[in-house]
């Protein structure tokens, strides 16, 4: 898991992981969403 303070920090990681730059920052951790 990637730690974060806002979801913008998660986008590059999630784009790599799921192919979509969709993410939320929950409890200081990135949560990726496909589509």
Curated annotation (Swiss-Prot):
Subcellular location: Secreted
Record keywords: Disulfide bond, Ion channel impairing toxin, Neurotoxin, Potassium channel impairing toxin, Secreted, Toxin, Voltage-gated potassium channel impairing toxin
GO cellular component, one term: extracellular region
Chain positions of site Aromatic residue of the functional dyad: 33
Disulfide linkage: 4-25, 10-30, 14-32
Tissue expression remark: Expressed by the venom gland.
MF term (GO), any: toxin activity
One Pfam family in the UniProt entry: Toxin_2
Marked site positions, Basic residue of the functional dyad: 24
Classification via InterPro entries: Scorpion_toxin-like_sf, Scorpion_toxinS_K_inh
Keyword Disulfide bond included in the entry's annotation: yes
Role: Potent inhibitor of the A-type voltage-gated potassium channels. Most potent inhibitor of Kv1.2/KCNA2 channels. Reversibly block the Shaker B potassium-channels (Kv1.1 sub-family), but with a lower affinity than PiTX-K alpha.
Family: Belongs to the short scorpion toxin superfamily. Potassium channel inhibitor family. Alpha-KTx 07 subfamily.
Domain comment as written in the entry: Has the structural arrangement of an alpha-helix connected to a beta-sheet by disulfide bonds (CSalpha/beta).
The name this protein goes by in its record: Potassium channel toxin alpha-KTx 7.2
Organism of origin: Pandinus imperator (Emperor scorpion)
